[in-house]
Amino acid sequence: MAEHTFGFRTRALHAGGTPDAEHGARAVPIYQTTSFVFKDADDAANLFSLQKYGNIYSRLSNPTVAALEERIASLEGGIGAVATASGMAAEFITFAALCQQGDHIVASSQLYGGTVTQLDVSLRRFGIETTFVPGTDPADYKAALTENTKAIYTEIVANPSGEVADLEGLAEVAHEAGIPLVVDATLSTPYLIRPIEHGADIVIHSVTKFLGGHGTTLGGIVVESGRFNWGNGNFPSMTEPVPSYNGVSWWGNFGEFGFLTKLRSEQLRDFGPSLSPQSAFNLLQGVETLPQRMDAHLANAKQVVAWLVEDQRIAYVNYAGLEDHPHHERAKKLLPLGVGSVFSFGVKATEKASGRLVGGEFIGALQLASHLANIGDARTLVLHPGSTTHQQLTAEQLAAGGVGEDLIRISVGLEDIEDIIWDLDQALTYATGLNHAGERVGESSADKVVEAEEAVAAAKAAEDAAAAEAAAGASCSLPTTTQEEK
């Protein structure tokens, strides 16, 4: 048969899915089973000793989950993938497979707050240290390397600051040191960028977000390029015999598939963060329409950004698609279709209220956009990261992550653009008392909050003063005892 390379949209629909041989079902079936029947005793023994590939138990592999893994690996240009129960689980099994006690990771400080905590708290408790690098200069990452560093980790488009990583520069630094470049591509998806083409070795996604796209199902995935030399001496756990599998070597026996085999046969086996078949099916439905949804997300986001930039109530907009953004040229090169639809902005302070207070009033007044801790939904979502997703970080970590106290994150959805802008406009007017042009059209709800707090404070001060005065008067009127009375 003639060879043909299928396009992205075709693979989003078909990769990893073949008609069911037994019943002819065209959609990927849901294999809702814990385990799979062996042909005979030898078949079972060979599967358990990794002498053949097949399904044993759904904690390790499942046909529905495998379809999702193959589809996303195809879209990313990787050799394979391992799916997990969440994006955080995908990160954890990757770090756990790469590192052991005494090892080290160099990571961007511009990461999702949960990732920072996993690296800075949980992994540190296991004896794995992380150095966080502010900014995107590869030279700074190189300076942070130690002899025990096992990976460089970054998000392509940072959540929520919007910085764009220098992938090619970071890949050069990582490969010179003999370690992999691991990237989180959740915000961009393979539709906007395929990091492996720019030097990344391992790509992680929270499939919960744009790949799934509907805010219904959790999932994560790890995709491998198949290009990294795991036998370079820096990863003994990849080359030394594995006792639990009768001395096989991940690199020696499985070659380019060694790391993925380690993830599946060791990390999923021991830690168990497996994706359920039902969840895999749900996420597959989202992947099928990824290109069409991303086109619509981008179109809406660009119009929202343009509107916010012109709004006199807005202090700043962090969006690498803007020409004055410091990473605009890099974004144009790496993400020619666009940088996505998740970005951040700040609301100006009023005469009485801080930007943070005004932002809180703005979020509370939204009628269409949802205030919740997710991104990449079909619906428009907003959040104040400083008090939610990043609230566990120190002031220094927040500053290094580009998360100001007034910063608001928005994930622009698929609603009619007129409705999205109407909602933002009416909420800003409610919070500030100003219209789009900065003209006074009413009272500011944020100022009212400040005035109410001032009134309460004044009343409390008056009450305290009155109490103090009464106490002083009572003290003066107390009877005294004379010397004669004594």
What are the residue ranges of the model-derived segments?
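N-terminal glycine-rich, Lys/His-bearing helix-loop that initiates the first secondary-structure elements
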Residues: 1-52, 436-486
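Conserved PLP-enzyme active-site core in the AAT-like
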Residues: 2-4, 9-21, 81-311, 318, ...
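Conserved N-terminal alpha-helix of the aminotransferase class I/II PLP-enzyme fold
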Residues: 35, 40-92, 114-121
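Short loop segments at secondary-structure junctions
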Residues: 35, 225-228, 347-352
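Short, solvent-exposed beta-strand edge segments and adjacent coil->beta transition regions
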Residues: 103, 338-342, 405-409
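PLP-dependent enzyme catalytic core of the Aspartate aminotransferase-like
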Residues: 120, 147, 349-353, 380-486
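Short hydrophobic/aromatic beta-strand micro-patches
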Residues: 223, 344-346, 411-413
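Conserved small-domain helix->loop->beta segment predominantly found in fold-type I
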Residues: 271-274, 279-280, 285, 289, ...
